[in-house]
Amino acid sequence: MNANEVIANRALELMGHKRGEYQYCSPNDHVNRSQSTNDAYPTAIHIGMYYTHLKLVKHFKEVIDAFRRKGEEFAHVIKMGRNQLEHAVPMTLGQTFNGFASILQDEVKNLDFAAQDFLTVNMGATAIGTGITAEPEYASKCIAALRKITGLDIRLADDLIGATSDTSCLVGYSSAMR
């Protein structure tokens, strides 16, 4: 809030008014414009995490493709399969690489599923989730603008109070990474 007051007071000076004449430029109404770190920061983190996820998946898919290529390349090389650290039955080295590719592909699906929660945001919830200091259409306008800017299917959380204190999407994604 202090930054908003500094900005408002400087604006007042530039407009020829005295500092503190907030009827002309209010720290809340004109500078802050319904923004809150309790909704803006988490929303930015969600969007940033989703973009990071997309980059990560791109690289995982490159590794999957490399495993598949090695699977084809070594399809004829026989080796001993292992079971509980002991030799088991014959298999090809190509099958081993294809197995690695399948495992990684399944993990990418898990990450994709977890990353969907990043698209649910609390923008417009303001300080505690009630949206009390924002205009009634503020949240829907923010979501529309974010969709337009990002091209992502961003959606507003059903319960803004809960979403304001909820970090489960970060915990869920971290869990999927393990």
Regions found by a protein language model. Name each.
Residues M1-R178:
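Conserved, well-structured ligand/cofactor-binding cores
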